[in-house]
Amino acid sequence: MNRRPRILVFDSGAGGLSVVHALREQLPDADLIYAADTAGFPYGKWAEVLLVRRILRVMRDLIDLVKPDCVVIGCNTASTLALDVLREEFQVPFVGTVPAIKPAAAQTKTGVIGVLATPGTVRREYTKTLIHTYAFHCKVMLHGAQRLAGLAEVKLAGGSVDPKDLLAEISPVFRKKGGAPADVVVLGC
């Protein structure tokens, strides 16, 4: 008898629960295990070398405990920083979540794309490579939102978020900068 595939979904907080929901719809027979590194949240503020070490340590413990057939990283920050290292370090397959720059470049009508992400994801070489490879013909407005992930966690936990705080975090990516405004915005938190 074949056993059900065991998939570990990992994120720094509750944001990856949307990944679990999508996986549940596509793979209803899979055993899904969700792990959030809330002790390390938010990842966007960490120094890169320290964050890679933390992710490796946490992932080693999770893989030993869960013994997954596959790991899905539901965090753009962790994926853009540590996905290659995780794939080298562990035998289990890893699937990352990275900013959806390729589909955004295909969908834009104005040629202007906004990327709303953590400061780390915005400045990462991985993100720049995605832009260079898939959106070279577009104007890409990057905005590293300092507090967006934290505001999302508060809301996901049932808390209240002041709309003014949210607007302050997201409005820079919607501002017109020397031409047409972004008609497609990518979320990369």
Segments from the language model and where they lie:
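Non-catalytic structural scaffold of enzyme domains
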Residues: 1-188
